[in-house]
A protein has these predicted regions:
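Pyridoxal 5′-phosphate
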Residues: 1-380
């Protein structure tokens, strides 16, 4: 393992829950570091009880966070970022601001989360566009070829997950976006499983929307997420919702992502996400990310030791992520999941689409926890 400040002592101090069980479900929701949670709790107490609390301090923290997140995903402008409650909300904002006409088509993948798929299916059922699907493969070249077969001049929207929530496969986002741009399609990327897990560079992708979470791999407070909106798209799209906050001081609609922020919001939660981001800067982002990479590789190597385990995630890090999915021959996912949680206190995520278990190896997990998982599977 990398010589990182994130060691056993730090994990014990910052993540006390890890002493009571193993949390391999960061892809569902992350565990917030204790010191960052305390910063949030103190801020909530002060904000909600002190009449003379300085709102400028809170607003300043929110804008600092906006700058940090823009930098984290390599956005060109700070104003390309708007805050949402979750990636699902970001997806809805993106899709809802596209006007579909008869004959339009939407292209997505065969491994999408309901956050995106349910919305796209609804559009198709209303007769507004036809839904087409490309197949995700372990090999990016094969995935790309499938995309090319589905995309055409009729494609109004190309929407896909950067990392599959089912298999943990990392899609070739840049190349897929190039295919979409050639036919003039809007491009939306579901980044629910990426930010805090793998590097993200939206300028490289040139997508119109990139929806991300703050509460999964970033391990921030629940209800903190954000949406990247390409500045060119923000100008041309007609917002579905406009209200107080969507306009600048002269009442003109904002010409950037911030037009999608309106009404009273729980800004105080963003104070907590900023505390987490600051903590990662202190620990070193690269070492944190390197730890996820090394733990994921170690997990897959150990799983391959068990003949009855079928790993659905590529070994190559450039083709995968911190999510690893596997099936156990002869056992249903309900049997395996229940066995791990009830008898070993190992929490995972079920993937019913492929009868698999998904393991999310975050930076606070350890080799010992992986060894214990392997021990449990061998005893099954």
């Amino acid at each position: 393992m990398s010589q990182c400040l994130i060691n056993d002592e730090l994990i014990k101090e910052e993540f006390p829950a890890c002493s009571r069980g193993t949390w391999f479900a960061t892809g569902i929701v992350g565990i917030m570091p204790k010191s960052a949670a305390k910063v949030l709790a103190d801020a909530v107490l002060r904000f909600e009880t002190e009449v003379f609390y300085n709102y400028q301090e809170l607003d300043s923290a929110v804008e600092t966070l906006r700058r940090r997140l823009a930098s984290l995903i390599s956005a060109e402008n700070v104003t390309d970022i708007c805050f949402t409650r979750n990636a699902t909300e970001g997806i809805i904002i993106g899709v809802s601001n596209i006007e579909f006409e008869s004959g339009d088509e939407i292209v997505t993948s065969n491994q999408e989360h309901g956050a995106l798929l349910d919305r796209l299916t609804y559009i198709e059922r209303r007769g507004r566009a036809k839904l087409r699907m490309f197949e995700i493969s372990k090999e990016p070249e094969e995935t790309l070829e499938s995309v090319k077969k589905q995309v055409s001049r009729r494609t109004k929207l190309l929407a896909f997950s950067h990392v599959s929530c089912q298999t943990g496969i990392r899609l070739p986002a840049k190349e897929i976006c190039e295919v979409g741009r050639k036919v003039g399609a809007y491009i939306l990327i579901d980044g629910a499983q990426t930010v805090g897990n793998i590097p993200v560079n939206v300028r490289d992708y040139e997508c119109d929307f990139y929806a991300a979470n703050g509460h999964k791999w970033l391990c921030g407070p629940k209800g903190t997420s954000f949406l990247y909106v390409n500045p060119d798209s923000a100008i041309t799209l007609s917002p579905t919702f406009l209200a107080f906050g969507s306009s600048s001081d002269d009442l003109a609609t904002r010409r950037n992502a911030m037009r999608f922020e309106y009404g009273t919001r729980e800004k105080i939660l963003l104070f907590g996400l900023l505390a987490v981001i600051d903590l990662y800067a202190k620990w070193d982002w690269e070492l944190k990310d390197g730890r996820i990479k090394e733990l994921s590789a170690y997990l897959r190597e150990r799983l391959n030791e068990i003949p009855k385990c079928i790993v659905h995630t590529p070994m190559d890090w450039d083709k995968s992520s911190g999510n690893t999915s596997f099936s156990v021959e002869g056992y249903s996912l309900e049997k395996v999941s229940g066995y791990l949680s009830n008898e070993w206190r190992i929490m995972t995520r079920s993937v019913p689409e492929i009868n698999a278990i998904r393991i999310s190896t975050s930076y606070f997990n350890t080799n010992k926890e992986i060894d214990r998982l392997i021990e449990a599977l061998k005893a099954l």
